[in-house]
């Protein structure tokens, strides 16, 4: 050995042993598995390291030769040779320096410095000194090279390279960071610097590491779920899955936390050592000054190591929470695509969004508290162990006192769990109703129903949800007080026991009191956190149970339909149902269900058009759903041969461009695409739009008319190249002439789909003549089948009876010869099936078809936006993202909503509580100094001192608990109520343009996540921020009082602290805003997907939509990952400032003692507070940032509160007479209007006069402005120029409620609301049941509703899903019949109903509204042929307005051409 000192010899062994063991393990399990790619681009650094190692080896050999110490030097040479090999392997295979090499070189530097520092005190030769100097120099060179120069030039990992090329987003630096960079979070420094100087955009945020991406995480989650599916037992199974699927991370978190706890409990020991050292200077034999300085250094090192481990622990628990949330979000979405119809009826879209927005958040927050369950008992054990060594058995007596409070806390916990469960149900109810309101806002405005829906939602919100939240707040406050006061009781009892057992032999002096106080403060954390842990665990348990019940809900039976590949046989059966009986709910032992379809025998063949005909509610749409497997098959069998395309009755249009809606993930084929849009009569529509088929349609196709939506949905089906086409009444919402064009282009002798299997439900008698077979449905049964000629000549034919009822209609005329024709080239739609869980296949080419169009791979439904696409016409605006600091106005509005008086009351309570807390420690200092002074008694008047201590402690707990109750319950709930109610009222009063340009996901995000933050998070964050800020100010005051010279260090550290906060807060604030912005598209995508679930399933697009959902999850979570990583970056730097303050306090106390001014009581008092400042400073920064970030939710709510409203509901000084309008005269005077300022005129210079009781038909081609004219009458859009008068009164001078409630409308889209039938007809509850039944009989609904179990109070599912489209339209008719207005507007009211139902509506209107003014917007020209006058619109202008007869006599009129195209002439 080179030294005789055995201690240093052992120190020198440590680096070598570490290199051999750690380096060997890292090489075996990591390096050698990687691909060998020699890469020496950093030429000079690698050769510099090789040269340094070679120099050390040569020197080591030389020294060994000279000193004859062969064994030690041989061992060292072997170690360096192995290190040289590792350096070469690192350079050849790794992108990141090896952790073992970095630590080895650091240890070498430290050990070499130790040898040189202690060389005066140990025997060391000149040769050994030379070796040490060379080793130090070479180790320092290698260490610096390893840290600052990567092994090779930056080369991305392959998975990062793909992401960079596809998205242009930078990979996360954490993958390329060395171990020291990871420990200090320096890898994120460049990003924080960028955020400090730039406003962050989504594209600036780095990618997630691959292990954190949803696509990778969900694989393990699903594998675990499937593997253990047989052992699933309630929600415990999901708990096990969440933990065991990440057991390595859980184990690492636990180990890290336990080591950090040990270091935390080293502090009281060092405080005791410091006090004992200072106390020695009050005796004749003081200790050596070097011992005191070593203690001070140990204080610094222990705190620094604790800081590193604590921040690693915080990073890991956030990572675990994010993984849990990712897996749950992904699994919930995947499950929602698989839910059965009955399961969907019990879980609305609002419920599912609530699972994703609220429940997953509660579960992801749980790891913050969860590991205290392990750490807490360990901390308590350490505290009691140290207290035992400090105070003996008396330390345990205090613990017994805490046991008394356990039953109380158990009761509190049970009550809390019960209340939390009720609260979540109330949140679900509110979310569900809010979703209904947003989805049906147009109807609410047209019917002037804002007030009843407002009252209904406020009842749920204020009477139920906030009331329960207030109860939870009181219960939490009681639990908090009980557990905080436990520490005071434990301390009091322990000190009392010490006096009793040891009072006569030992004084309770500072070296016992303040270490004990520090230990009791450390003991306070697990005890004080226990209520929070219990409440968080209970909240998460409720959420886990809810999610688990959702994940095990019934799924569609994909085996209900037997699917086979398409064949080459020309007329083979493509779709067949044999003796099928179907229902929407599954029959169980407890639940008997009535089948919707009974004994269905149905066949659809290749190359044939099969039509399904029947009255409203007969089961036409249900039959198509049964063919797709979306209903429960109670008996029989269903066979499907080939791929499927589906066009729904209510067209599903997602938020993208028109082209993307048509392609729906298919490759773009210009020729096929061109023929598709011609066949679907879309060419002219594209010419209308500024951007053609690149126009963004908005959510639910907000910028499209009903006919355009239907034809785009139809074009999607045509373009998909399927074998089987299921078309659900696609002709109902298009103009009559367009309908005839579609019939010829698609179903005629040379139609586009003539060589394919087409199943069409229809109310159009015209298309039946083209059908190869017709099925007549009635009450869920097939009552007749045959072709048109067969059914028509049959004496008792159901079809013939209906035709005879309408034999006076011209709708049954043959197709006119002049209908637009298209090339007769046959287009092959090569079949391919895309059904989840089945093998993808492609049929052979049909004999009579070209093989030009093959089945195509599905692509993302939304294409990447290029620079050329920017600036295109969009239907929805980007979400507004505020920049810079949250404005002071936002804070002021929040505190104002809390009540300034209550805020001041909070400050009174918290300042008083902290003052009382300081008073308890000042009293302990005074008591400890008095003890031992008296020669006659070691501890004079102990019970007096204990009584005062207990009194101060009780006051402190009472004040602090009162402050918590004031801020969270009184302020938080008051603010939440005000902000939510104000936002709700504003949104209900917002113009329709707001909803057309704002996705429902954004709005629902405000009402779910942002309202949750305001209710439960913002007040809590401000409470902790104010509490910690005041507490730190008191601590700094104590330190400055006890160590005045520490101001010399504290003042510059304070400015460094402020700079660090300012440097960090800009990035953090922008990340938090981006987090809010990127969350909205996730919920919007969920809502959009669930709205079009049947379409997505039919096309087999589940996987594409799942990938889109995963992408949106990752987009949000890469922002969140950078947010909490940047939080760790600032915390580790701020806490280092706190560590220096603690070191300064201890060093000053030691220095003062050495210089002759020992004061152990004051030093102990100041140190007991100083050790709190590290966490305190970090908490202040984090909580100030959290306060600002969470206040962003307030800012977002205020943004919606300030949305421009419609005109007032009521203008008191301009209220119309009760009987207004008495006549029903309507006049448009030079009326012009736009939907938005940036758009062209939708109506231009309209001048018409409509007499009282006149019947006006409004016609025109698609996009002519027919529905816009109707919206203008209801002031859904406001005039840009001119005015509308009703009975000579300008309608703009009246409030909107007064106007809209005096008009009646049957809208184009029949929207009904979840609840019951009565609420849908009379939400104001003004009418009797008798009156409603009378109206239902007139509307032909009485028989249908009376058969329901609960009659008028029967449940209506979300969106009226349990009623057919025709029934929903008749409910809208019933609403009109319940009003007594003079003006009725029919906006294509019978577009989607059966001809017989159409007749019912028309006859009812003619009979019941003959003395009223009626304006009819029509697609079917025959429905307005008996109108008094016809208004023809084109491009928003009046083209013709005259009597029907006169217009028909004029063969040059547009109306004449429309009537002729419809076959009515």
UniProtKB/Swiss-Prot annotation:
Domain named ABC transporter: residues: 575-804, 1226-1460
GO CC terms in record: fungal-type vacuole; fungal-type vacuole membrane; membrane
Annotated GO biological process: heme export from vacuole to cytoplasm; transmembrane transport
Membrane topology: Multi-pass membrane protein
Family: Belongs to the ABC transporter superfamily.
PANTHER family: ATP-BINDING CASSETTE SUB-FAMILY C, MULTIDRUG-RESISTANCE LIKE PROTEIN 1, ISOFORM I
Extracellular topological domain: 1-8, 64-69, 119-129, 257-291, 384-394, 502-511, 921-939, 1055-1465
GO molecular function, one term: metal ion binding
Function: Iron-regulated vacuolar transporter that mobilizes stored heme from the vacuole to the cytosol in response to iron deficiency.
Record-listed ATP 2 binding positions: 1260-1267
Top-rank lineage group of the source organism: Eukaryota
Induction: Induced under conditions of iron deficiency and negatively regulated by iron through fep1.
Classification via SMART domains: AAA
Region (Disordered): 805-824, 840-869
Name assigned to this protein: Vacuolar heme ABC transmembrane exporter abc3
Positions in the Cytoplasmic compartment: 30-42, 91-97, 151-235, 313-362, 416-480, 533-899, 961-1033
Cellular location(s): Vacuole membrane
Keywords, in A-Z order: ATP-binding, Heme, Iron, Membrane, Metal-binding, Nucleotide-binding, Repeat, Transmembrane, Transmembrane helix, Transport, Vacuole
Transmembrane segments: 9-29, 43-63, 70-90, 98-118, 130-150, 236-256, 292-312, 363-383, 395-415, 481-501, 512-532, 900-920, 940-960, 1034-1054
Residues the record lists as binding ATP 1: 614-621
Domain ABC transmembrane type-1: 250-539, 903-1189
SUPFAM superfamilies membership: ABC transporter transmembrane region, P-loop containing nucleoside triphosphate hydrolases
One Pfam entry name: ABC_tran
Record: residues binding heme: 151-152
């Amino acid at each position: 050995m080179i030294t005789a000192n055995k201690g240093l010899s052992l120190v020198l062994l440590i680096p070598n042993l570490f290199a051999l063991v750690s380096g060997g393990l890292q090489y075996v399990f990591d390096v050698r598995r990687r691909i060998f790619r020699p890469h020496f681009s950093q030429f000079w650094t690698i050769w510099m390291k090789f040269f340094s190692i070679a120099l050390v080896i040569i020197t080591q050999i030389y020294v060994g030769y000279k000193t004859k110490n062969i064994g030690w030097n041989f061992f060292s040479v072997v170690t360096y040779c192995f290190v040289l090999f590792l350096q070469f392997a690192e350079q050849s295979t790794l992108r990141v320096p090896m952790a073992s090499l970095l630590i080895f070189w650091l240890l070498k530097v430290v050990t070499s410095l130790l040898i040189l520092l202690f060389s005066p005190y140990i025997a060391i030769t000149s040769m050994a000194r030379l070796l040490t100097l060379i080793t130090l120099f070479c180790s320092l060179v290698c260490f610096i090279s390893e840290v600052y120069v990567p092994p090779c030039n930056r080369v991305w990992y392959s998975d990062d390279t793909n992401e960079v090329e596809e998205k242009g987003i930078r990979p996360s630096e954490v993958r390329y960071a060395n171990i020291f960079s990871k420990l200090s979070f320096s890898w994120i420094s460049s990003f924080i610097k960028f955020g400090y100087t730039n406003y962050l955009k989504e594209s600036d945020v780095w990618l997630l590491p691959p292990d954190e991406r949803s696509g990778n995480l969900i694989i393990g989650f699903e594998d675990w779920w499937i593997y253990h599916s047989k052992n699933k037992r309630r929600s415990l199974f999901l708990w096990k899955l969440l933990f065991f699927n990440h057991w390595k991370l859980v184990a690492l978190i636990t180990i890290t936390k336990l080591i950090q706890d040990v270091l935390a409990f080293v502090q009281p020991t060092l405080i005791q050592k410091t006090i004992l050292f200072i106390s020695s200077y009050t005796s004749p034999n003081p200790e050596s000054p070097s011992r005191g300085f070593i203690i001070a250094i140990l204080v610094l090192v222990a705190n620094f190591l604790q800081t590193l481990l604590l921040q690693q622990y915080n990073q890991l628990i956030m990572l675990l929470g994010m993984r849990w949330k990712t897996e749950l979000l992904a699994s919930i979405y995947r499950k929602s695509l698989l839910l059965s119809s009955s399961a969907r009826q019990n879980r609305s879209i609002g419920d599912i969004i609530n699972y994703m927005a609220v429940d997953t958040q509660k579960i992801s927050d749980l790891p913050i508290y969860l590991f205290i369950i392990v750490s807490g008992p360990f901390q308590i054990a350490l505290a009691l162990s140290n207290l035992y060594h400090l105070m003996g058995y008396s330390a345990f007596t205090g613990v017994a006192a805490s046991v008394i409070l356990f039953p109380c806390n158990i009761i509190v916990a049970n009550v809390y769990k019960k209340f939390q469960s009720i609260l979540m149900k109330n949140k679900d109810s509110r979310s569900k109703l809010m979703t209904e309101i947003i989805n049906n806002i147009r109807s609410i405005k047209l019917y002037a129903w804002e007030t009843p829906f407002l009252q209904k939602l406020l009842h749920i919100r204020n009477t139920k949800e906030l009331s329960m939240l207030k109860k939870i707040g009181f219960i939490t406050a009681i639990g908090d007080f009980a557990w905080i006061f436990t520490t005071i009781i434990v301390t009091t009892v322990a000190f009392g026991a010490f006096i009793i057992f040891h009072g006569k032999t030992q004084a309770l002096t500072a070296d016992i009191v303040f270490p004990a106080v520090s230990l009791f403060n450390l003991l306070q954390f697990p005890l004080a956190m226990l209520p929070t842990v219990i409440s968080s665990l209970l909240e998460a348990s409720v959420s886990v149970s809810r999610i688990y019940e959702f994940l095990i809900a019934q799924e569609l039976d994909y085996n209900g339909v037997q699917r086979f590949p398409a064949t080459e046989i020309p007329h083979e059966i493509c779709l067949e149902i044999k003796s099928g009986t179907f229902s929407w709910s599954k029959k169980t032992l407890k639940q008997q269900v009535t089948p919707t379809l009974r004994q269905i025998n149905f066949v659809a063949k290749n190359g044939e058009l099969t039509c399904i005909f029947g009255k409203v509610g007969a089961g036409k749409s249900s039959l198509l759903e049964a063919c797709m497997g979306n209903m429960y098959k109670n008996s029989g069998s269903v066979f499907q041969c080939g791929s499927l395309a589906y066009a729904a009755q209510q067209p599903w249009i997602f938020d993208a461009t028109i082209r993307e809606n048509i392609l729906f993930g298919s490759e773009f084929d210009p020729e096929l695409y061109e023929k598709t849009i011609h066949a679907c009569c879309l060419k002219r529509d594209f010419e209308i739009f500024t951007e053609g088929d690149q126009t963004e349609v908005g959510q639910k196709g907000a910028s499209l008319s009903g006919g355009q939506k239907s034809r785009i949905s139809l074009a999607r089906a045509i373009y998909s190249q399927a074998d089987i086409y299921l078309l659900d009444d696609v002709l109902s919402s298009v103009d009559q002439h367009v309908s005839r064009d579609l019939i010829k282009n698609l179903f005629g002798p040379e139609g586009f789909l003539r060589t394919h299997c087409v199943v069409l439900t229809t109310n159009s008698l015209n298309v039946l003549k083209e059908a190869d077979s017709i099925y007549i449905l009635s009450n869920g049964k097939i009552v007749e089948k045959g072709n048109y000629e067969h059914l028509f000549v049959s004496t008792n034919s159901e079809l013939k009876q209906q035709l005879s009822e309408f034999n006076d209609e011209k709708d049954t005329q043959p197709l006119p010869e002049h209908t637009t024709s298209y090339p007769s080239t046959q287009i092959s739609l090569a079949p391919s099936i895309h059904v989840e869980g089945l093998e993808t296949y492609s049929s052979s080419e049909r004999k009579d078809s070209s093989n030009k169009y093959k089945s195509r791979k599905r692509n993302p439904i939304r294409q990447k936006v290029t620079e050329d696409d920017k600036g295109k016409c969009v239907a929805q605006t980007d979400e507004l993202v505020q920049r810079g600091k949250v404005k002071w106005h936002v804070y002021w509005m929040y505190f104002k909503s809390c009540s300034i008086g209550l805020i001041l009351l909070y400050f009174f309570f918290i300042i008083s509580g902290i003052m009382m807390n300081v008073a308890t420690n000042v009293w302990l200092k005074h008591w400890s100094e008095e003890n031992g002074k008296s020669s006659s008694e070691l501890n004079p008047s102990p019970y007096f001192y204990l009584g005062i201590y207990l009194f101060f402690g009780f006051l402190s707990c009472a004040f602090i608990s009162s402050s918590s109750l004031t801020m969270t319950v009184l302020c938080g709930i008051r603010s939440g109520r005000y902000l939510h109610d104000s936002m709700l009222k504003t949104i209900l009063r917002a113009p329709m343009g707001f909803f057309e340009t704002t996705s429902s996901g954004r709005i629902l995000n405000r009402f779910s996540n942002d309202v949750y933050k305001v209710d439960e998070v913002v007040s809590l964050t401000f409470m902790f921020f104010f509490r910690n800020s005041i507490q730190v100010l008191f601590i700094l005051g104590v330190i400055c009082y006890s160590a005045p010279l520490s101001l010399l260090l504290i003042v510059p550290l304070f400015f460094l602290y402020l700079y660090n906060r300012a440097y960090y807060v800009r990035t953090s604030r922008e990340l938090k805003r981006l987090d809010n912005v990127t969350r909205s598209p996730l919920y919007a995508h969920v809502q959009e997907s669930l709205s079009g679930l049947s379409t997505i399933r039919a096309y087999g697009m589940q996987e594409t939509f799942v990938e889109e959902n995963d992408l949106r999850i990752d987009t949000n979570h890469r922002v969140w990952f950078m947010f909490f990583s940047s939080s760790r970056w600032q915390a580790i730097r701020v806490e280092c400032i706190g560590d220096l303050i603690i070191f300064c306090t201890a060093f000053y106390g030691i220095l003062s003692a050495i210089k002759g001014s020992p004061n152990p009581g004051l030093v102990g008092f100041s140190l007991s507070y100083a050790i709190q400042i590290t966490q305190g400073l970090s908490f202040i920064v984090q909580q100030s940032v959290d306060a600002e970030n969470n206040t962003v939710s307030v800012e977002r709510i205020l943004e919606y509160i300030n949305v421009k409203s419609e005109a007032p509901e009521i203008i008191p000084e301009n209220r119309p007479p009760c009987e207004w309008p008495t006549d029903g005269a309507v006049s448009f005077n030079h009326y012009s209007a736009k939907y938005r300022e940036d758009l062209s005129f939708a109506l231009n210079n309209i001048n018409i006069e409509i007499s009282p009781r006149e019947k006006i038909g409004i016609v025109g081609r698609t996009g002519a402005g027919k529905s816009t004219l109707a919206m203008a009458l209801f002031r859904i859009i406001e005039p840009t120029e001119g005015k509308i008068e009703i009975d000579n009164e300008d309608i703009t001078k009246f409030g909107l409620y007064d106007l809209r409630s005096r008009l009646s409308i049957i809208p184009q889209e029949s929207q009904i609301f979840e609840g019951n039938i009565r609420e849908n007809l009379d939400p104001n509850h003004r009418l009797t049941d008798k009156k409603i039944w009378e109206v239902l009989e007139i509307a032909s609904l009485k028989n249908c509703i009376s058969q329901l179990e609960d009659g008028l109070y029967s449940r209506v599912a979300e969106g009226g899903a349990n009623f057919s489209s025709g029934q929903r339209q008749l409910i809208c008719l019933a609403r009109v019949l319940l009003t007594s207005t003079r003006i009725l507007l029919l906006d294509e009211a019978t577009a989607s109903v059966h001809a017989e139902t159409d007749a019912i509506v028309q006859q009812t209107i003619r009979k019941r509204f003959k003395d009223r003014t009626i304006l009819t917007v029509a697609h079917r020209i025959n429905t307005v042929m008996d109108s008094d006058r016809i208004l023809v619109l084109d491009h928003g202008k009046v083209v013709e307005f005259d009597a029907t007869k006169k217009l028909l006599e004029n063969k040059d009129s547009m109306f004449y051409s429309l009537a002729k195209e419809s076959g009515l002439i």
